[in-house]
Amino acid sequence: MSIRKILQFPDYRLRLLSKPIKIINKKTKKIIYDMFDTMYANNGIGLAAPQINILKQIIVISSLKPTMSELVLINPVILKKNKKYINTIEGCLSIPKKTAKIKRSSCIKIQAINTYGKSFTLTAKSLLSICIQHEIDHLIGKLFIDYIN
């Protein structure tokens, strides 16, 4: 597969809205493979398609712990957010060398589609919850620095 160029802030394309995926075909799967290659080549734990200048609602997340598989989230939607928040230090492949303390929901429930076109729900806690929220923000043109007061 291919390693793609990651858009860097303040590139205006990072602020654009992504469109839902209608059909999962070979082209979609190639984008997903390229996203994983790009994420790992840049030592990331998550990547959203807009970061590689593809305005589609696709997110990939690495296996954050040995018992977890890699995740592909197509057209993800947050169904529920826990009212308990956690503050963590976040960074972003599109904003290198910058981190900030960000407040995120500690637990979320999402709905998404997998690479086989099947809808599923997932409850995510801790780091996975934070990572998913961060990547979903990319799909709506929002960056972690937007949360800094």
Swiss-Prot record:
Superkingdom per UniProt: Bacteria
Positions of the catalytic residues: E135
Catalytic reactions of this protein: N-terminal N-formyl-L-methionyl-[peptide] + H2O = N-terminal L-methionyl-[peptide] + formate
CDD domains according to UniProt: Pep_deformylase
Main enzyme class: hydrolase
Positions contributing to Fe cation binding: C92, H134, H138
Co-factor: note: Binds 1 Fe(2+) ion.
One Gene Ontology term of the molecular function aspect: metal ion binding
SUPFAM superfamilies: Peptide deformylase
EC number: 3.5.1.88
GO BP, one annotated term: co-translational protein modification
Pfam families given in the database record: Pep_deformylase
Keyword Lipoprotein on entry: no
Cofactor: Fe(2+)
Keywords: Hydrolase, Iron, Metal-binding, Protein biosynthesis
Function of the molecule: Removes the formyl group from the N-terminal Met of newly synthesized proteins. Requires at least a dipeptide for an efficient rate of reaction. N-terminal L-methionine is a prerequisite for activity but the enzyme has broad specificity at other positions.
Family the UniProt entry places it in: Belongs to the polypeptide deformylase family.
HAMAP family: Pep_deformylase (MF_00163)
Record-given protein name: Peptide deformylase
Organism: Buchnera aphidicola subsp. Cinara cedri (strain Cc)
Lineage of origin: Bacteria, Pseudomonadati, Pseudomonadota, Gammaproteobacteria, Enterobacterales
Gene expressing this chain: def
